[in-house]
A protein has these predicted regions:
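The feature captures the catalytic groove of carbohydrate-active enzymes
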Residues: 75-91, 106, 124-183
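Substrate-binding groove/exosite segments of carbohydrate-active enzymes
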Residues: 1-125, 130, 137
């Protein structure tokens, strides 16, 4: 895979950090976008957002991203959450949004329409009357906050908001005004 993007600055350490990050993501780009290439070699959809941003900046379009998004969708028939974590399913929506904005692959987006709409409807049903999220699945954001329920709630609230904004845009693009209005 050719490196299309690059970074350099007056601080050689920052340039080296960028190079190592790009190389690490490159190693993870196999048939799918693997996470933890030395460790568990799984498609952790919750971690794919920074990876897809890096892929787009460094390599441009790569089919491994769409294969990974499809794999996560196909392995998570609703109401099952991706990797068993509701935040990961929310990240899937945001990655769809970013990938579509960057690549404009309408055919790929259309192939996500039914699942996307069903997922957004599920999440819309997990909002309490006071506007707070009420996600029952594994309430996980990241390891440093795993034992902090208030921080997890705030994180899920924010991630849910961003996912609904992304979902509204995608559903509007797909001509699904009914689901867009739920967002």
């Amino acid at each position: 895979v050719p490196y299309l993007g690059s970074f350099s600055c007056s601080d050689p350490l920052l340039t080296r950090i960028w190079d190592v990050g790009a190389y690490t993501v490159h190693l993870n780009m196999q048939e799918y976008v693997w996470d933890g290439i030395k460790r568990d070699r799984l498609v952790w959809i919750g971690d794919i957002h920074p990876e897809t941003s890096t892929i787009q900046a460094v390599f441009g379009y790569d089919e491994s991203v769409e294969r990974s998004l499809d794999l996560a969708r196909d392995e998570s028939p609703l109401p099952k959450m991706m990797c068993g974590i509701s935040a990961y399913s929310l990240w899937w929506i945001m990655v769809q949004y970013g990938w579509y904005l960057q690549n404009g692959n309408r055919t790929f987006l259309e192939s996500q329409k039914d699942y996307l709409a069903e997922l957004l409807r599920y999440f819309a049903g997990r909002i309490q009357e006071n506007g707070a999220e009420d996600l029952p699945e594994n309430r996980f954001i990241d390891w440093p906050t795993a034992d902090k329920p208030d921080v997890i709630h705030a994180g899920l609230q924010g991630i849910m908001r961003m996912a609904f904004q992304a979902g509204e845009f995608l559903c509007t693009e797909l001509g699904d005004g009914e689901t867009a209005r739920l967002c």
